[in-house]
Amino acid sequence: TRELELGDDHDGIIELPAEAPVGSDFADYASLNDPVIDLSITPNRQDCMGVRGIARDLAAKGVGTLKPLRSVYRMPAAPLPTDGPDPDVATLDPEGCPAFYGQEVRGVKNGTAPDWMARNLKAIGQKPISCLVDITNFVMIDLGRPLHVYDKAKLSGGLVARKAKAGEQVLALNGKTYTLDEGMTVIADSAHVHDIGGIMGGEDSGVSEATTDVVVECAYF
């Protein structure tokens, strides 16, 4: 699967189920034949940084029909996680982070994203990671609104956007430790720096399969 960019497994030949049509193109069978459109967005069209913004623009020109948002997001029949109390979030760096919002969600279950979501992410070069992370990436690509998700249990108090202190360090999600300076905007709680604002999240508050409560961040850097 690694050679075909279908996953990280590299143990041997992929065995297809018995009902797979013999002689058919594998790309057609595995739904890997969707066209990929590569766009270069000019600075004045930030509304087209997501798929929906592009679709809205095309629909306005008579190319296709813009689907209602509710028909795009497939809501499950099972009970949804519940919203928790509003988390304590604030920005002390109005220049680097003019807007900083958060929403606590309780009772989530992390795991593998649905196949349809994983396929959509892979089609545009995004590697599926986990359900919670994949949802934030899907929303970002669809609506053009970057999000970040924290494991609530790994936070100490509220979250604040502020300037970094000289010499502060953060272990990022890519496994590297970065030393910060006063010109950088970070997201921190009372104990740790958790994000380099608008660039990369931190490992200390990353979600895992054991995560049950999260804080979803929506910020403007």
Predicted regions and their residues:
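Glycine/proline-enriched, intrinsically flexible loops and inter-domain linkers
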Residues: G62, L66-E168
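Conserved catalytic alpha/beta cores of large enzymes that bind or transform nucleotide phosphates
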Residues: T1-P21, N110-G111, V133, Y178-F221
